[in-house]
């Protein structure tokens, strides 16, 4: 049984939603990145979604773009990102860990070499943000060879054709967008309709995680009540990092408190 499946089963038994933080590896440095990730895990993260820094992250808003640039400025290599992931895996054996990255990084490394490296590092899933699902077949085949779950983004206006295609390839969970566009720009986060959630579930039985604009407990509870299994939160955490670049202790303390607060919001009694 996969780590994702075990995690979702456990959370279902506990009547909790899933809280998945997103940060960019190497922001603001590899050393601090490791401390930040460990803080997230120790204060309630049920799984991790980690960004591999890229110079032109089209799906990301300004907050995450700046995080990528800070990481790239440190000249961390692709392999160093995987080494950090391996360190986390060795310490947290049962934690689901996924990465989000862009296709150029995969092509430059070689598709087969990339997925082999994911396997070696102990990764559970890969989300390639800019590969259309119609072009995913070669990635999917090799991902399956190495037991790497393929994660797909599902927008709130997805039609039957897209939902059908996602159902063919998706494994682990489905990443539901709160709204169209890029991450972290608009303050308004759409509450996904129960009708839309039920429509997705007709095509796929995978757990659903809502992302884009998640930053407070009320949003998390609304998301779970709408029928999702939990949330992914990135920009709000990275904003804490950016505001405390020269105050490391304050940064870690704020991340600790924020993570605990958001995880606590997943534990309300669901009707």
UniProtKB/Swiss-Prot annotation:
Active site, renumbered: 49, 60
Transmembrane segments: none
Catalytic function, reaction form: (1S,2R)-1-C-(indol-3-yl)glycerol 3-phosphate + L-serine = D-glyceraldehyde 3-phosphate + L-tryptophan + H2O
InterPro entries reported for this sequence: Aldolase_TIM, RibuloseP-bd_barrel, Trp_synthase_alpha_AS, Trp_synthase_suA
A Gene Ontology molecular function term of the record: tryptophan synthase activity
UniProt xrefs under Gene3D superfamilies: Aldolase class I (3.20.20.70)
Disulfide bonding pattern of the chain: none
Cellular component annotations (GO), alphabetically ordered: cytosol
Enzyme class, first EC level, given as a word: lyase
Record keywords, A-Z: Amino-acid biosynthesis, Aromatic amino acid biosynthesis, Lyase, Tryptophan biosynthesis
EC number: 4.2.1.20
Pfam families xrefs: Trp_syntA (PF00290)
Subunit composition and interactions: Tetramer of two alpha and two beta chains.
NCBIfam families tied to this protein: trpA
The protein's role, per its UniProt record: The alpha subunit is responsible for the aldol cleavage of indoleglycerol phosphate to indole and glyceraldehyde 3-phosphate.
Protein name (record): Tryptophan synthase alpha chain
Protein species of origin: Buchnera aphidicola subsp. Schizaphis graminum (strain Sg)
Taxonomic lineage from the root: Bacteria, Pseudomonadati, Pseudomonadota, Gammaproteobacteria, Enterobacterales
């Amino acid at each position: 049984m996969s780590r994702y499946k075990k995690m979702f089963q456990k959370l279902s038994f506990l009547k909790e939603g899933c809280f998945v933080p997103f940060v960019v590896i190497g922001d603001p440095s590899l050393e601090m990145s490791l401390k930040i990730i460990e803080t997230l895990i120790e204060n309630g993260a049920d799984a991790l979604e980690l960004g591999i820094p890229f110079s032109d992250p089209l799906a990301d808003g300004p907050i995450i773009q700046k995080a990528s640039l800070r990481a790239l400025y440190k000249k961390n290599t692709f392999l160093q990102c995987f080494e950090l992931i391996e360190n986390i895996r060795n310490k947290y054996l049962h934690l689901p860990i996924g990465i989000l990255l862009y296709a150029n990084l995969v092509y430059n490394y070689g598709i087969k070499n990339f997925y082999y490296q994911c396997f070696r590092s102990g990764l559970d899933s890969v989300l390639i943000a800019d590969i259309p699902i119609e072009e995913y077949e070669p990635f999917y085949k090799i991902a399956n060879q190495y037991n790497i779950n393929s994660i797909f983004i599902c927008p709130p206006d997805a039609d039957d054709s897209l939902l059908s295609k996602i159902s063919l390839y998706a494994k682990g969970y489905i990443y539901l967008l709160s709204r169209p566009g890029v991450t972290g720009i608009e303050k308004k986060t759409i509450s996904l309709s129960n009708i839309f959630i039920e429509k997705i579930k007709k095509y796929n039985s995978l757990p659903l995680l809502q992302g884009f604009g998640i930053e407070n407990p009320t949003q998390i509870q609304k998301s779970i009540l709408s029928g999702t299994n939990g949330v992914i939160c990135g920009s709000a955490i990275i904003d804490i990092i950016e505001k405390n670049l020269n105050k490391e202790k304050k940064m870690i303390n704020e991340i600790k408190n924020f993570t605990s607060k958001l995880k606590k919001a997943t534990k309300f009694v669901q009707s």
